[in-house]
Amino acid sequence: MAFGSMNSSDDSPMSDINVTPLVDVMLVLLIVFMITMPVLTHSIPLELPTASEQANKQDKQPKDPLRLTIDANGGYYVGGDSASKVEIGEVESRLKAAKEQNENVIVAIAADKAVEYDYVNKALEAARQAGITKIGFVTETKAQ
């Protein structure tokens, strides 16, 4: 055996080094570096522009974008008709009709901040299926 006993007559020091803990630590470090390196190499440093309220007022807003409202419960409302709730299939057909009337139609999605992302994703998919490429999101500006 590699381990000596107290009663052994062999007084020479044990020359075998146990490398198992060293290998374990090295493998853990290797795994940590393998996980963190893609995160470090794929980040792109950006300095995003900031917009003031004055700059927002100066932007030319398109005339009457088609408003698609999504309430907190996931209900869809197309246009200014807040009384009639429609299903996602009806949303797509109304967006197609708007695209046929105006080739450059712009959709403004106004989603409640409590709505799940899945409902917004379905609205975006309906707009894509209708062939609409100009889509914006309605937000509130922070009061300073």
Swiss-Prot record:
Residues 40-144 are periplasmic. It comes from the Bacteria. It is found in: Cell inner membrane. Pfam families: ExbD. Residues 1-18 are cytoplasmic. GO terms for biological process: protein transport. InterPro entries: ExbD. The keyword Transport applies. This is Biopolymer transport protein ExbD. It comes from Neisseria gonorrhoeae.
